[in-house]
Amino acid sequence: MNRTVSTLSSTVSDVSVEIPSICNVINTELPTSDVYLYTLKLILLDYINEPRFKEAALLSNRTGTSRVLSDKTNHQQTQHGKKLVVDKQDDMSERDIVQATLRILKGKLAQISGNKNLAPNEMHWKSIVKMYYSMLDSSSADTFSKMGQMEEVVGYFTNIASNELKKMTIKNSRDELFSEVAYFIDLVIDVLPDSCANIIKRLLDYKINLKKGETTVKKKRAASPATVPQYRSISGSTISNKQPSFKVQDISHMKYFMQLFETDETKLHQDVMAVKDDCTNPIFCGELRYLRKKIKKDNGTLTASDFSSDREYNLWKNYELLEIANLMDRFEIGEKVTSHGNRLIPKDAKSVFVRLIGLVLKKECSNAVNAINLSQEALFFFHKSARYWRIEYPSTISSLVYSAANLSVLGDEELNIPITENLFSVIRNKYLCSEDNLDPSAWNAQDRYLWAANLFHTTDQSMRTINNLLTAIFSGTKPKFSPVLSFYYSNIVGDPVMEFYETQSVAVKKYWIKLFKKTLFKASEDYFVSLLQDMLKANAIEIQNVQNLVETIIEAIKAIQKRYNKPLLDEISLPRQCAVFLCEVYGSDSLNLIKTAEKSTMKMTGQKLGPIDALDMYDVLKELRQIYLQVKPKGKFFFNLENYFIKYLTRLCDDVSRNVQKVIKSSLESENWQPVNDQDHFSRSVLDIFKMINESTSMLEKFGWQNEFQLAQMITVILKAFSDGMLSYSAQLMELIQRDLQEGDEPSYSLESSDTRSSLSLNNANVNHEKSRSSRLFEDLKNVVKSTPKMVAPAPYQFKKRTCVLLNDLDKTLFLLESFEEKADPSKISSVIAQYHSSHNLEDNGKSFDDQNMKQVYTLRIIGAENIKGFSKTGLSNTYVSMRNITLQREIGTTKIVARSITPKWDEEFVFESPFGKSNDIMFTIWHHPHSRLKNLAEDDLCGKANMKFTPRKLKDDGFPIDFSLTLNPQGTLYCQISLESEKIDAVSSMGRIYRSFSRSRDRAINLIVNKFSDFIAFAFSRTTLKTVCGHHGSALASDEAVYDAILPLFDYLNANLNILASELSQRLLFMVMLRAWNLVLENADLLLLPALNSAKVNILRSAKKSLWENTLSTTKTVSGYGRPLTQAEIEAVFKWLDALCVDFFHNKGEGPPLAELKNEYYQNILLIPAFYDKSVSELKDEVQRLIPLYEEYLRWFYLKKTPITFTNKSAGTISRKKSLVANIVKEPKEQLERDAEVMNIILRILIAKGQHDYVHRILHDRKELVNTMKNRRAVSRAVTPTGKKGRN
């Protein structure tokens, strides 16, 4: 019989282990008539033995003595505990009686200690408490175990009471001591049975002697019979010998009995008359003797096998024998009847008792819901039935009362915590008074089994209660499991008896865990259905309705998670289980609901569902998926959210891309080019644009898209649109800057003669000249000055405020781009896409788009030219290069003008775009810009031109620069570099394009600004200015004051221009302008100090054109295009100017750029000139010969050993590459070889100044051959082992 609980209605069929059941012990099908009959006989037996029917004579002749004290009432017995039961005093030694009495007395003292009201007064109570603690003290255990006489117990208490009284000040302490000892003796006598008459007699004598004032106890082994007072009625008169009438009205407890069994008086009277003859003392005593006989033969209701030890069995056996003897003392009147027919004591006494007590409890609790309040009538049936039917052993009656409650008032399916707790309290306080009885695991097997069966019944109720609470898990008011669980763990799991049934407990728990999960699933299903029904009440299902449904589900899960943070029964995580079930219930309909909402939107509005609404739906579904995967890691969500909602993300991305360019365009149209505030000098459009792009990317990130590749693609598209818009923005800013700098008057310069003080003003006659052509003033100044003039600083150029705002915008954009890059991380985006393509064997993302919509970007670098045609009297030209795309019929750009040179160096970059795969024919033209006043309105002169066709098939699409040179017509060579990059839908490429565009624009704008006062810098560092200091021949020794006075106008002029800029530019930009101006100063000083290195070739060519006679007549050591070498005095004057400008003007005690940036590499190279300038030609040549091998080693390092350019990952194309790929090559630390090469160049230039043109030309020719050799070797090396990777892959 596999049962899990004790009631017939609560069974678990799938538990394979046998579960203790009340039905296995108690006959729950017992007819009520049997209970009725035995209970009626019990009442009648007690009725005929009431004191009013007793004769006023000595009690039992068998014992030869009787107690002086009358039996305590039933209420008193209940209040103070059980009596010791001894059949005959001779059956047990007095020592055994004393030890048994101490055990029962201990429980009685415990009750009094816990309730002060049970003691006569506080003094008595304190002594009782002290005695009780002494009995608990392990150190006193040996003393109590050795006690063999009751007088020893009384004497021990006397000492305790005496010691307590000594602590207090009491007048009659002697009388108080006697009173307390007498009270204690009464407690002991109350425990002893009538069969212990000798011991009781001695205690009574001791008590009488106390009243007489005696202080010693006389120990007597024998005692004469004591007289017993007559029983008196309530009125105090002596009871006469009455006979029972057996009338219902005369029988005690009959009214309660009729209510208990719902019978009428007539029928009851008939039943009384029918059974009264069976309710006699002889019959009852005969049945008691039969029970005693069976117990003595070890064949009673319990046997030794039911106990854990013989000692425990003997304790029970002695207890029963003593109690039976006690009953026989009361009921036996001399007549003996042999009876074992169970006429008074039921054969199945336990089942009858349980049914009876069940009826009593139902009646008593009919008006009380949360407590068991027993009346005196009820207590009569509790205790009389247990005593007369011999089931009053503490463990037995406890388990039976528990069973009766479970089969009656606690018979509901769910747990009644208040009544159950009250029941446990009644059992502990009334039946398990002694601590030895409180542990059910120490009980006999039958009682332990029945107790366990009741616990399983309560377990079943607890589990059903929890199961019912689980049905309300999704309600607004969350169910509270803690009261049930607290009761369950403290009273059931914590009960020691459950250790004997651990297997059964595990099986039951497993069953209920399984059932709980089913209940949770059903609750989740019902909850979702209710939500769905609410949603379907609307006319149409909209996406917002579906989103609200999912949000409600998420909130419900979170509410459960917040409320229940501990597993139910340490097994079920309610938040996890509810989340799994609720998600799975919703998941089966999730996609259909979304599709229905999409169709509904199309039907109502005629348009597709908006991307924002759809992505909001994705957001909540993503959160639900995250919850589901957290609670079920190995689970699979119901459909791929990203693959379904990607169409909406794509639409949103397209909208954002269009909006990006729209915002940039509108920002330009509404811009007034005014600073944002006094501290920030840039305009509002910069902030608006970056606010827009940050919000755009943040909006995508806000959705938390879980497909990294898809998100990277979308951001890439937005960055491409951003790149296109920003390139347009950069171009328009640069156009405005050029327009501003082209407008306005050119500055006019004045020279005052030292003799006449007359001044000459030279103004620009054509203020609207072409934007790329600079002032023609320098040659005019040089031709006009006929004496030693004094230079006067002109008025500063009036830069427009708008120009400065535009420049600030360019710089601020670069700064914000760096911040945006850290946030957007384009390198990671590109890497994600590349890894996806690699893992899926797809082509490069940039090539997956239609080539017709893509562009190719050419970066053209104009480096310099050689041997171009000269136009001035000195054979020099003021040259610039213009470039035009003949294929697209579009101007590419124009370089700055390099004055007075046939070997100009421009080193400028230009970018142009072309349709993908289209060749471009570029026309390069070098012009001479004359400064002559007579040609102000004339066209510029042509120095040379050349064509070059760039075909994408012949250029590597990797962004690496390729050197090429063009032979000019009619003469000269132009040196350039070209690099090609194909436009790609790539984050790194897009950001790199923006940065390079703005970086180039900013640098070009700075150059244009600095060029506005470049002519005066060139004039200040000229031979004309030197003549004012050192004379026409450079031999005059001028004072330091004269040297500094000569350059002072330049100080004033630069200061005036920079002050204008300082008020409108940021410090960062101002320093950049100052450093560019300083480099311009160094360039002019360098040209003044030494002839250019390529002038050796020019002089050789010109010498070859002269006749022998002309060369012989030329006695002056002049260099073509440079003039005579400077004297030592002139050299010193120039370096004094440089030092003054560097330290006093530009650095200005830390107010300007740092000295480390001012004393740059260029400056350090110029400082080499004085070290070699005064050396002889032979010494210089020897130094050159020493350096030639080092220069060869330098070339091998530069072309073959230098770290090759490779771009991978983040370095591939991020905005940190600055201007362009070629300009962003990682520079190696400057090594000694490179330094030696610079030294060699300086020495060669000095040799040119000393007239060693042939020697220098030969050295340069050998170096050129060596360079070509190294380039060829590098080309071969790269062909064998490619090192240049694509810049953005």
From Swiss-Prot:
Keyword Cytoplasm recorded: yes
Pfam families in UniProt: C2
Domain MHD1 per the UniProt entry, residue ranges: 615-733
Keywords of the record: Cytoplasm
Cytoplasm is among the record's keywords: yes
Annotated region described as Disordered, given as residue ranges: 745-774
InterPro entries in the record: C2_dom, C2_domain_sf, Glucose_resp_signaling, Munc13_1, Munc13_dom-2
Domain MHD2 residues, every copy: 1044-1184
All residue ranges annotated as the C2 domain in the record: 834-966
Predominant location: cytoplasm
Residues spanning the signal sequence: none
Subcellular location: Cytoplasm
GO cellular component terms, A-Z: cytoplasm
Biased composition, class Low complexity, residue ranges: 748-762
Classification via PANTHER family: ADENYLATE CYCLASE ACTIVATION PROTEIN GIT1, C2 DOMAIN PROTEIN (AFU_ORTHOLOGUE AFUA_7G02350)
Misc. comment: Present with 300 molecules/cell in log phase SD medium.
Listed name of the protein: Uncharacterized protein YOR296W
Organism: Saccharomyces cerevisiae (strain ATCC 204508 / S288c) (Baker's yeast)
